[in-house]
Amino acid sequence: APYNDLEAVEKLFDTWGSGIAAVIVEPVGANMGVVPPKKDFLEGLRRLCTENGSLLIFDEVITGFRLARGGAQEYFGIQADLTTYGKIIGGGMPVGAYGGRRDIMEVVSPVGQVYQAGTLSGNPVAMAAGLTQLRYLNAHPEVYTHLEALGERLYGGMEKLCQELKLPYQINHVGSLGCMFFTEQPVVDYTSAKSSDTKAFAAYFRYMLDHGIYLASSQFEAMFLSDAHTDEQVDETLSIMRNYFERTVQNA
């Protein structure tokens, strides 16, 4: 089913009911740019899964420990049954993890009968780095206040820029995650994201790179703000963006 299309998911449940083992979803679509969930979308998925005895599985590799200490589940107030994690939990080291309800996790060894192992599982260097990272976030909740403020400053500034210059582009953002889609169409799913002008994005990316701002090189990747970023750096980024788009408008 398409992201943000609760009706399509409902039709699948009408057809298959409890035969659906799980619904797997990014709570914020972050691998097609950034696509926030529509109002009641995640809540609707939670309701359908509960009613049919299906698992709700959140892919929080990107949103986990970024939107909030409790990830998107804390941010939106929706609890998943299982969750996958990566990126931030490694403190800069490669790591992946999953977790969830006790009754599900107890099916996995050594408590349960489902065996899971890997040559690099529990790598001590990655575990030490990740544990240090999570302890820091636990002790410094102000990190999230700072990230939210940076997000509002950058993405709000981009929205203002588009309004002032009458640019027909879409600024999608949730917390410190954001994306400028080079399309007139509101972006709510993969299909609408694909309506973006990738050639226009490529020209924008090249200009920003030439002026010292290294963005993700694909229209369909998210922008990530870090606690290390400053208001001054955000303002510099917005200034360079303005210079580019003012030139673009003049040359149109």
Indicate where each model-derived feature is located.
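Conserved N-terminal phosphate-binding loop of PLP-dependent enzymes in the Aspartate aminotransferase
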Residues: 1-252
